[in-house]
Amino acid sequence: MMMDHENEQRADVMQPIEELRYLILAAQREGNRLFAEALRPLRLTPSQAEVLRVLQDHEPLSLIALGDLLVCETGSPSRLVQGLVEDGLVERIPSSTDKRMVTLTLTNLGREMAANVGALESQFYEANAGVVKDAPLAEILEFLWRFVEGKPAGIALARRMGRETERETLAL
């Protein structure tokens, strides 16, 4: 019985920064879960969808350059890419000068799938826009950029947006 009372007290003393951390985690997980459900008819995971969209916007890319633009992967995306190659969505083109290097491009099927993912993303964003309708979005974005500044995912997203640093993103 004493434990239940202690747990109630613990919930009352959660620090605001701790609450923020868990809210960010919960929002990310819920968003990922909802997006995964939306992608299910395409038989793609959110990570695979991200690879397709990054290639759609930036192809051709080396495996290393792709990895530098992904938020879903902090290491090499080789396994992720391999699955997309096996599904006929991505093509690996060997370098003529360095056999260790490959260039990644979308196949015709991959371009079609990336377009489908883009349409699903638009529907997803529209369906969830009401959640942030009256929120101070510019301030929230500024805070989140500060939160990821200098971290691999923040750096990858800044690169993907065509900015060298998160600071350039914050200045907008």
Please give the residue ranges for each predicted region.
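Charged, amphipathic alpha-helical coiled-coil/dimerization segments
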Residues: 32, 82-142
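C-terminal regulatory/oligomerization modules of transcriptional regulators
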Residues: 1-12, 134-172
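Short amphipathic alpha-helical segments with heptad-repeat character
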Residues: 21, 25, 29, 71, ...
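N-terminal leader segment of winged-helix/HTH proteins
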Residues: 1-42, 89, 169-172
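N-terminal helix-turn-helix DNA-binding core of bacterial DNA-binding proteins
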Residues: 25, 29-74, 87
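Residues within helix-turn-helix
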Residues: 63-64, 75, 82, 102
